[in-house]
Amino acid sequence: MKKMEMILNAIKEGVLIVDREEKIEFINDAYAEFIGHSLEEVRGKLLTDIRPGAKLPEAMKKGEVQEQIHRVEKGKEYFVNMYPIYENGEVTGGISTVTFLENARFLAEKIGELNEREAYLDARMKEVNG
C-alpha cells in the first residue's frame, strides 16, 4: 500500500477510506490537513467520532454513490463525492473524496488565462498572415 499512499498523497483532493464498520483505514495528506489530524491519529477510529457530521456512513448504508455534495465547514467550501466499496455484491467500505473550492477556483483562473492567451495569439497570427 506504500506506493498507493504516495500516489494518493500527491493529489490535492482529500481522500478518506473506511472499512465496513466505518472505521478509518486511510486518509491522505490533504484530508489530514483539512481535519487537523494525521493518519496515525485517526486510523482505526470510527469516522463519526472524528467527523460527527460525516455523510459517508449514510451512503454506505444505502449503497448509493453521492457526487458533488456542496459543503461549507470551518470557513472552507468544498465538494464531496462518496462511493460505497463493493465486494461480491456487499458493501465492505467506502471512499470519500473532497475537492476544495480554492483548488477549483485556481484551475478555473488558469483556464481563463490560457483562453485569453490563445485569443491573443490567434489575433496576432491573423495579423501576421494577413
Each model region followed by its residue ranges:
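Sensory modules in modular signal-transduction proteins
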Residues: 1-34
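Short, contiguous hydrophobic alpha-helices characteristic of membrane insertion segments
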Residues: 4, 50, 116-118
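Glycine-rich acetyl-CoA-binding "A-motif" of GNAT/NAT acetyltransferases
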Residues: 91
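Flexible nucleotide-interacting loop at or near the entrance of a catalytic core
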Residues: 100-130
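Terminal output helix/cap of sensory domains in signal transduction proteins
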Residues: 35, 39-40, 46-79
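Sensory-domain boundary capping and coupling elements
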Residues: 95-98
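A short, aliphatic-rich beta-strand micro-motif
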Residues: 81-83
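Sensor-regulatory modules in signal-transduction proteins
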Residues: 85-87
